[in-house]
Design a protein with these regions (language model features):
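Fe-S-dependent hydro-lyases/dehydratases of central metabolism
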Residues: 1-195
């Protein structure tokens, strides 16, 4: 039995509309365990809006979840870093020491269903033992498309008149010397594939 401190669901992996609907189904009418912090990052603005429109977002919030921006976040250790020696369940696609932002945290990669059930139980939990079979969640015929916050690039003609304003802390990238055609040096470190 593994007690947990934190659960993070979503980001760019395991954050589709269907994944989020499964999470909302599990959380509906339940509460996140007192000792657990649950953070959910829907995979896109469209997914977030669809969850808001059908009531699933309210189910997540009512259960005690913190809703994060649809962006990189806990996956890269930017926010929601677990406490020192804490146990965090995450639905992300990467895991290595320190990735969460806390070098000595215990990070377990799990499915959205395991994450949601465990957030309620306060410990790593098999959803099949708690819920039995999950219902099928049908993919909507039409997905919401709302790009109202995306600023399209200027045309070639318009771009000549675009002024880019830099603050005093923004500097141009230093330009180095071009690489030589041939480089001969000693290799000091070779790393494996799990970086």
């Amino acid at each position: 039995e593994i007690d947990i401190d934190q659960v993070c669901i979503g980001s760019c992996t395991n954050s589709s509309f269907t994944d989020m609907m499964k999470v909302a189904y599990i959380l509906k009418g339940r509460k996140v365990a007192e000792n657990v912090s649950l953070a959910i990052a829907p995979g896109s603005k469209q997914v977030l809006t669809m969850l808001a429109e059908n009531g699933a977002l309210a189910d997540m919030i009512d259960a005690g979840a913190r809703i994060l921006e649809s962006a990189c976040g806990p996956c890269i250790g930017m926010g929601q870093s677990p406490n020192s020696k804490g146990i965090s369940l995450r639905t992300f696609n990467r895991n290595f020491e320190g990735r969460s932002g806390t070098a000595d945290a215990g990070i377990y990669l799990v499915s959205p269903e395991v994450a949601a059930v465990s957030a309620i139980a306060g410990k790593l939990t098999n959803p099949v033992k708690v819920l039995g079979d999950m219902p099928e969640f049908k993919i909507p015929e039409h997905f919401l498309i709302n790009d109202n916050m995306i600023e399209m690039p200027a045309s070639v003609e318009e771009s000549a008149d675009v002024e880019i304003k830099y603050g005093p802390n923004i500097k141009n990238v230093p330009v180095g010397k071009p690489l030589e055609d041939s480089i001969s040096t000693q290799v000091t470190l070779k790393v494996g594939d799990n970086i």
